[in-house]
């Protein structure tokens, strides 16, 4: 053996630092390592009596120096003498590396430049693995760690299996806390993976399985558990080989061959590479953290290669494997965050996608019970987390559950109130951070370093800190020791030399901390911080689109602007918040101030303001809103309720309550499920009550629209109480597609006798219990409704009869919209009877898509003769045809008829119908506006209409002919008519094939004409220079004429509908 002088560090000097008790413990621990079988030959009495110097002589005489060094380092760590371990590592680094490289060849062509030399920490981890896998021969029994193989020496496959098993057992230590619930979760998802499910038989084709989900939910744990199952021969589908490829580690490699990529950690298998790869059907590849590969756009599909000996960039090699150009028969399992799914969809052939959702609610509850031990404390803490929907959602990540439990348990033990801690995620994370260090620790520099690392990583879209990154930023690994001990950082157990944050959400919190802390003077001169910008850049809409991980950091930035939290941080770390942070946040680039916003922008802003818990800040921001549109789920209702009640200038509010995430939405028959839904409801009701209180407190709030929403009985009750109150001043109310069915009925009753409501739309109710409630509203003597929209509702003939009678009684309604209802013959006749009633004051009526036929038009024509008030009628999307038009024209000819606007959009009208309309328009008719859009009137129909336009008695002011199949040669007739017409103000020729010649003819006519036309709509070729020049000439000579070149599509809202309903 070797002398002590040949060791890489002075072990004797280190042992002299130990007390007598510590030296005895060192002796005991070092003799427990089975690898040093030579130690077994040494009498224990010699070891027991030896002092430090004698012990070193014994060890170095009988054992290999590499073993003595690694074992000693491990013993020092077990004794918690990290000072001695670190000191030894500094001395042994170079010597140990040389020693290790003599014993282990370099990996398959990966040079030192391509792969950095192993550090002593990495050597120590490998030593632990090798120590467990060490083989000892005794007769015909071979021992491999704790495994026993009878009859023969283990082959390379068995040895590799055991090393992998040892490696992946470490996964249960990769996050703080117990692992029982993690294992339960892993077993649950394993049944969804074909090659780990006993019910799925092996098929002729290999599987590609993609596990996807947000960060920290257990994708890597599940992948590593699969590897462990393979190593222990517990995988249902038997693979001879399995390889674990960590993209976190691979992202640091330069170009290499596929063989070098896969076998870089298995140099002992390099002679068998061709044999192994030839058995692709028996190989499982686990590609973990695909989103961490950091490949440039297009890199994965560029230069795809099937040659496993050819050097290529790592993304190309993985892309070739996923695309099944490389080893097409191998089985693949990939884990990724959702952001990389697009690339996978392009690459992978018919993958099976499995969404990993982490801890279910029962998992979280079980975890809390095990962590606390005391059931009362556990359930109190669990309910506190559950009361904050955003925090509860984060709790699907095991690490977040551990943070919550650790923080709240400590507070309860101290007798502190944990309720404020769970109010916001910022409050919880700050309390957790401060609880890991004593107050007054003055760790200002260390915290700023950590927050800088978090920000750098978040901008790079990684939670991993590589040793090279630390060196580039001037950070020593020893600087991270405090945060490793505090469980804020974790050392990666697969990719050595890497560190990661406990969870992405905590990294986002630390990033926000970097931007909100007051800068030190030396930082202003430090160039390496500028590449991640300031708060303005962090909250930039453009940057958040590029990197969605920044969004939550923006939330936490607002949360850290809270003065109480700033004091807590200063007391612990000696750090101060920037005094200008609030003003910087107010200047941020969230583009939804003043009401001009997308729903996503607005929800982000409300979430940010809620995190701040600063009412003055909220009031200042929300005062700018006059209109607001909220999409609410269990998470968003909390910040929305907190902020909207401070919208003192709000005039209009739109709500969409998402069914999937709010209370009472989960269908279940079991009684415990009913209880659970009731508990959900109780958590959410206070916030909903706060939100609805604005209807009674804000006298300027006049408009409410609730669309596509699920409202439980409790939510409806609270809403009804608020809108029925005397202090509610709503004028326009819209309820569209609200479930369950009885919600419409209850909301209608809440409006009964409401004096200020003048506009009401009810849409999408398929139950018949709403009509009696609506009739009550209409009959009430204090009803002031002027507009009623009853759209797409189901009703019986008797209910249409009741509604017709209510319309006769009502004295306020002037406009009724019955679109998309099946009136049929009986319903139509009942309505016509009402329209004939002398006390019916309806002026505008829409019967769009009510399944009316030409026969209904005969009765309707009679109504037009006797009705004293009806001025607007819409019959769009009813197949009345030419015969129906003929009947209508008979009624319109009577001088008693008051109708001014008639909409016949898409009514199966042809040129024959235009002939009857032409005869009507040539007489002195009351009709001023006519919409014939989407009817095939063609050349002949257009000729008839132009004939009418030429007549001096034609009073038509608006003519809409969108999509009427008008060809270019009809433009000659039209130009002639426009030249002499003195009444037409609006003409719509959109979506007609007028051609360049027809449009040119129209433009030339308009250039010379001094007629009454003020709005012309048509489609032109944007690239026709001649037409564009004529258009400019018209605009110059006739600035009052507006020419709409149809940049938008009118299907969503017809032009005629603008003037139809109030």
Curated annotation (Swiss-Prot):
Annotated NACHT domain ranges read 207-526
Enumerate the LRR repeat regions by residue range. Answer: 812-832, 841-861, 869-889, 898-918, 926-946, 955-976, 983-1003, 1010-1033
Cross-referenced Pfam families: LRR_6, NACHT, NLRC4_HD2, NOD2_WH, PYRIN
| Positions of the Pyrin domain | 1-94
Alphabetical list of SUPFAM superfamilies matching this protein: DEATH domain, P-loop containing nucleoside triphosphate hydrolases, RNI-like
Report the locations given in the UniProt record: Cytoplasm
Resulting phenotype, residue 258 to S: In OZEMA18; uncertain significance
Query: Which UniProt keywords are present, listed alphabetically?
Result: Apoptosis, ATP-binding, Cytoplasm, Disease variant, Immunity, Inflammatory response, Innate immunity, Leucine-rich repeat, Nucleotide-binding, Phosphoprotein, Repeat
Top-level taxon of the source organism: Eukaryota
Its family remark reads: Belongs to the NLRP family.
Illness association: Oocyte/zygote/embryo maturation arrest 18: An autosomal recessive female infertility disorder. In affected women, ovulation and fertilization proceed normally but embryos are arrested at early stages of development or cannot establish pregnancy after implantation.
Name recorded for this polypeptide: NACHT, LRR and PYD domains-containing protein 2
Write the gene name.
NLRP2
């Amino acid at each position: 053996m070797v002398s002590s002088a040949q060791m890489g560090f002075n072990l004797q000097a280190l042992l002299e630092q130990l007390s007598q008790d510590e030296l005895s413990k060192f002796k005991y621990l070092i003799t427990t390592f089975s690898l040093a079988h030579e130690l077994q030959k040494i009498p224990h009495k010699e070891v027991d009596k030896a002092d430090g110097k004698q012990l070193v002589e014994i060890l170095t005489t009988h054992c290999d120096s590499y073993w003595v060094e690694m074992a000693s380092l491990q013993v020092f760590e077990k004794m918690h003498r990290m000072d001695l371990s670190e000191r030894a590592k500094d001395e042994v680094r170079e010597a140990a590396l040389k020693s290790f490289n003599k014993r282990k060849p370099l990996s398959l062509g990966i040079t030192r430049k391509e792969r950095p030399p192993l550090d002593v920490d990495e050597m120590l981890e490998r030593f632990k693995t090798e120590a467990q896998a060490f083989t000892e021969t005794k007769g015909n029994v071979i021992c491999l760690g704790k495994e026993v193989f009878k009859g023969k020496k283990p082959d390379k496959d068995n040895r590799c299996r055991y090393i992998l098993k040892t490696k992946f057992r470490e996964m249960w230590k990769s996050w703080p806390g117990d692992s029982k619930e993690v294992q339960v979760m892993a077993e649950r998802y394993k049944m969804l993976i074909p090659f780990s499910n006993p019910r799925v038989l092996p098929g002729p084709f290999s599987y590609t399985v993609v596990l996807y989900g947000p960060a920290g939910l257990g994708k890597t744990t599940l992948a590593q558990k699969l590897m462990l199952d393979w190593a222990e021969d517990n995988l249902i589908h038997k693979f001879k080989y399995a390889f674990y490829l960590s993209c976190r580690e691979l992202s640091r490699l330069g170009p290499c061959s596929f063989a070098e990529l896969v076998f870089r950690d298995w140099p002992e298998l390099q002679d068998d590479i061709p044999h192994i790869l030839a058995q692709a059907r028996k190989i499982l590849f686990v590609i973990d953290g695909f989103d961490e590969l950091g490949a440039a756009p297009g890199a994965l599909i560029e230069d795809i290669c099937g040659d496993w000996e050819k050097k290529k960039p790592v993304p190309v090699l993985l892309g070739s494997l996923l695309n099944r150009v490389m080893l097409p028969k191998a089985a693949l399992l990939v884990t990724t965050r959702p952001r990389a799914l697009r690339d996978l969809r392009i690459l992978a052939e018919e993958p099976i996608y499995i969404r990993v959702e982490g801890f279910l609610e029962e998992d979280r509850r079980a975890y809390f019970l095990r962590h606390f031990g005391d059931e009362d404390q556990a359930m109190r803490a669990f309910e506190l987390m559950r009361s904050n929907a955003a925090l509860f959602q984060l709790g699907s990540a095991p690490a977040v559950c551990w943070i919550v439990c650790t923080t709240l348990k400590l507070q309860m033990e101290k007798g502190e109130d944990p309720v404020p801690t769970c109010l916001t995620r910022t409050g919880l994370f700050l309390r957790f951070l401060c609880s890991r260090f004593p107050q007054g620790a003055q760790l200002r520099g260390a915290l700023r370093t950590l927050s800088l690392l978090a920000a750098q990583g978040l901008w790079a879209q990684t939670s991993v800190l590589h040793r090279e990154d630390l060196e580039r930023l001037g950070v020593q690994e020893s600087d991270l020791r405090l945060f490793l001990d505090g469980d804020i950082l974790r050392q990666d157990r697969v990719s050595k030399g890497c560190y990661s944050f406990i969870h992405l959400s905590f990294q986002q919190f630390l990033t926000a901390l970097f931007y909100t802390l007051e800068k030190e003077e030396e930082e202003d001169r430090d160039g390496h911080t500028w590449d991640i910008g300031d708060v303005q850049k962090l909250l930039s809409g453009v940057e958040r689109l590029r990197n969605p991980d920044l969004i939550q950091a923006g939330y936490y930035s607002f949360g850290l602007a809270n003065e109480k939290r700033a004091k807590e941080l200063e007391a612990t770390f000696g750090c101060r918040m920037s005094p200008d942070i609030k003003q910087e946040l107010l200047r941020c680039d969230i583009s939804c101030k003043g009401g001009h916003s997308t729903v996503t922008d607005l929800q982000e802003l409300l979430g940010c303001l809620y995190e701040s818990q600063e009412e003055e800040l909220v009031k200042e921001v929300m005062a700018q809103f006059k209109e607001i549109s909220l999409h609410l789920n269990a998470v968003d209702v909390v910040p929305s309720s907190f902020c909207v009640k401070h919208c003192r200038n709000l005039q209009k509010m739109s709500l969409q309550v998402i069914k999937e995430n709010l209370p009472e939405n989960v269908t279940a028959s079991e009684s415990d499920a009913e209880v659970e839904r009731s508990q959900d409801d109780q958590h959410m009701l206070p916030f909903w009550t706060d939100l609805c209180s604005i209807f009674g407190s804000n006298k300027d709030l006049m408009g409410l629209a609730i669309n596509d929403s699920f409202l439980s009985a409790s939510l409806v009750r609270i809403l009804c109480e608020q809108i029925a109150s005397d202090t509610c001043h709503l004028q326009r109310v819209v309820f569209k597609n609200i479930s369950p069915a009885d919600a419409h009925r209850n909301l209608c009753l809440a409006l009964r006798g409401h004096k200020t409501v003048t506009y009401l739309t009810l849409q999408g109710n398929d139950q018949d219990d709403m009509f009696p409630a609506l009739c009550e509203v209409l009959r009430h003597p204090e009803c002031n409704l002027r507009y009623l929209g009853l759209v797409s509702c189901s009703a019986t003939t008797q209910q249409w009869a009741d509604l017709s009678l209510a319309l006769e009684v009502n004295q306020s309604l002037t406009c009724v919209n019955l679109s998309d209802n099946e009136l049929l013959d009986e319903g139509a006749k009942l309505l016509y009877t009402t329209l004939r009633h002398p006390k019916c004051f309806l002026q505008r009526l829409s019967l769009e898509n009510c399944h009316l036929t030409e026969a209904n038009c005969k009765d309707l024509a009679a109504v037009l003769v006797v009705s004293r008030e009806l001025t607007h009628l819409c019959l769009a999307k009813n197949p009345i045809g030419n015969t129906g038009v003929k009947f209508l024209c008979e009624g319109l000819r009577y001088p008693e008829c008051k109708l001014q606007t008639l909409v016949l959009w898409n009514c199966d009208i042809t040129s024959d119908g235009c002939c009857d309309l032409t005869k009507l328009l040539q007489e002195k008719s009351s009709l001023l506006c006519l919409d014939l859009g989407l009817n095939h009137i063609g050349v002949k129909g257009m000729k008839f209409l132009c004939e009418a336009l030429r007549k001096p008695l034609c009073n038509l002011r608006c003519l809409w002919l969108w999509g009427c199949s008008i060809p270019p040669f009809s433009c000659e007739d039209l130009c002639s008519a426009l030249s002499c017409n003195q009444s037409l103000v609006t003409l719509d020729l959109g979506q007609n094939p007028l051609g360049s010649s027809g449009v040119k003819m129209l433009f030339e006519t308009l250039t010379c004409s001094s007629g009454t036309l003020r709005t012309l709509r048509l489609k032109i070729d944007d690239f026709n220079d001649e037409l564009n020049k004529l258009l400019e000439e018209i605009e110059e000579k006739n600035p009052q004429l507006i020419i709409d070149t149809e940049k938008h599509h009118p299907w969503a809202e017809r032009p005629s509908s603008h003037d139809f309903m109030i």
